Swiss-Prot record:
Monomer. Substrate binds at residues 70-72, 77-78, 203-208, 232, 234, 252, 293, 299-301, 312, 318, 397, 402-404, 414-420, 424. Pfam families: Alpha-amyl_C2, Alpha-amylase. Its cofactor is Ca(2+). Belongs to the glycosyl hydrolase 13 family. Keywords: Calcium, Carbohydrate metabolism, Glycosidase, Hydrolase, Metal-binding, Signal. This is Alpha-amylase isozyme 3C. Its EC number is 3.2.1.1. Ca(2+) 2 binds at E134, T137, D139, D143. InterPro entries: A-amylase_bs_C, A-amylase_pln, Alpha_amylase, Glyco_hydro_13_cat_dom, Glyco_hydro_b, Glycoside_hydrolase_SF. The lineage of its organism: Eukaryota, Viridiplantae, Streptophyta, Embryophyta, Tracheophyta. Ca(2+) 3 binds at D153, D168, F169, A172, D174. One of its GO terms (molecular function) is alpha-amylase activity. The active site is at D205 (nucleophile), E230 (proton donor).
């Protein structure tokens, strides 16, 4: 009897250890701002601080905060004095530190929006060109001149820098990331954001603006726990204006970047967003590629893919590439139960009043230990229905078709449902929600 009890105890310990490892891997990112957040009376940091408990209740593990520094544009994407946090339109440096501490008290990690492809200068040089930069400190850190601008950015450069390693950004000087002083001082600034301000990871804005080799330098120099890059490529479209079924070239670019940078580096899965927002318009056959896998980055390298429905660019008031508004919850049913790291948008939780539905789906993810590398088995992908099983524990259906025949085993029961989506969970042993990591 004692031997049997010991064996059972060891088995239970092994099961809990395995489940715990899945929970440790499970990640849900929350974008904690939109394009208009800088206008908030009383400051966005203070406003968000008052909602930390609400955000934690959605089950997120990471929160993505806006660019923290002085910027010519109020949203933060035209940065200048990088060390000057008090000039941010979102609030002061002290308010930012307090907000990060509040999230940390809920075991939520904070991701800074890092804009380093380009930078705005404070002063003109002898040519009358704005290319003299101030770092925001009494000393010379990040106090640069035209030598630190890419030589082929002829509007600003003096021609002495290296050529740009990525795409051009026309609205501000493209920084020469092959310059050793640039690399050293930007790495020091990033490490200061970690050690002094409290950030845990980076969201790399316009990462197409510099090479993956450059990105790897900053990731290796700063050892963040989480990194996600914005690599917004143009999808392929057919003659009728619809996205092509095959988007392998688009997702290959994302995979190549993540593999080249290595470590914790991941990329926003723009391919999945594009395919999914077309698919929910009665074309759910799009959600399975020719090899029976998911059509986005999550079909090839899910561990490094961050899926999303909308963000401050594609949605919000910019609305440049929005998900169909009446089908947003179908999108969340997909990304919150599928491989990859799902990202929840602030607007959908608070402005669209979808907090309860999104939280329910996030709880299903946590309870069943769904993680970036979870196993995906697509059971059906027709025009009006998509059904998939994840880790043999969860089944998700999206689409207008109500009857899915015998695709749902008898030992599965409904745990979440809404407008044209439903999620089932396998009966039996449940993974406890536990402490989020």
């Amino acid at each position: 009897m004692a031997k049997h009890s010991t064996t059972m105890s060891c088995l239970l310990f092994f099961v809990l250890l395995c489940l715990g490892s899945h929970l440790a891997q499970a990640q849900v990112l929350f974008q904690g701002f939109n394009w208009e957040s800088w206008k908030k009376q009383g400051g966005w940091y203070n406003f968000l601080h008052s909602h930390v408990d609400d955000i934690a209740a959605t089950g997120v593990t990471h929160v993505w905060l806006p660019p923290p520094s002085h910027s010519v544009a109020p949203q933060g994407y035209m940065p200048g004095r990088l060390y000057d946090l008090d000039a941010s339109k979102y609030g002061t440096g002290a308010e930012l530190r307090s907000l990060i501490a509040a999230f940390h008290s809920k075991s939520i990690k904070c991701v800074a929006d890092i804009v380093i492809n380009h930078r705005c200068a404070d002063y003109k040089d002898s040519r009358g060109i704005y290319c003299i930069f101030e770092g925001g400190t009494p000393d010379s850190r990040l106090d640069w001149g035209p030598d630190m601008i890419c030589s082929d950015d002829t509007q600003y450069s003096n021609g002495r820098g290296h050529r740009d390693t990525g795409a051009d950004f026309g609205a501000a000087p493209d920084i020469d990331h092959l310059n050793t002083r640039v690399q050293t001082e930007l790495s020091d600034w990033l490490n200061w954001l970690k050690s002094d301000v409290g950030f845990d990871g980076w969201r790399l804005d316009f990462a197409k603006g510099y090479s993956a080799t450059v990105a790897k330098t900053y990731v290796d120099n700063t050892d963040p726990s989480f990194v996600v890059a914005e690599i917004w490529s143009n999808m392929r479209y057919d003659g009728n204006g619809e996205p092509s079924w095959n988007q392998d070239g688009d997702r290959q670019e994302l995979v190549n970047w993540a593999q080249a940078v290595g470590g914790p580096a991941s990329a926003f899965d723009f391919t999945t967003k594009g395919e999914l927002q077309a698919a929910v318009q009665g074309e759910l056959w799009r959600m399975k590629d020719g090899n029976g896998k998911a059509p986005g980055m999550i079909g090839w390298l899910p561990e490094k893919a961050v899926t999303f429905i909308d963000n401050h660019d594609t949605g919000s008031t910019q609305n440049s590439w929005p998900f169909p508004s009446d089908k947003v919850m179908q999108g969340y049913a997909y990304i919150l139960t599928h491989p990859g790291v799902p990202c929840i948008f602030y607007d959908h939780v608070f402005d669209w009043n979808l907090k309860q539905e999104i939280s329910t789906l996030a709880a299903v993810r946590s309870r069943n230990g769904i993680h970036p590398g979870s196993k995906l088995n697509i059971l059906a992908a027709d025009g009006d229905v998509y059904v998939a099983m994840i880790d043999d524990k969860v089944i998700t259906k999206i689409g207008t078709r109500y009857d899915v025949g015998n695709l749902i085993p008898s030992d599965f029961h409904v745990v979440a449902h809404g407008n044209n989506y439903c999620v089932w969970e396998k009966s039996g042993l449940r993974v406890p929600a536990g402490r989020r990591h």
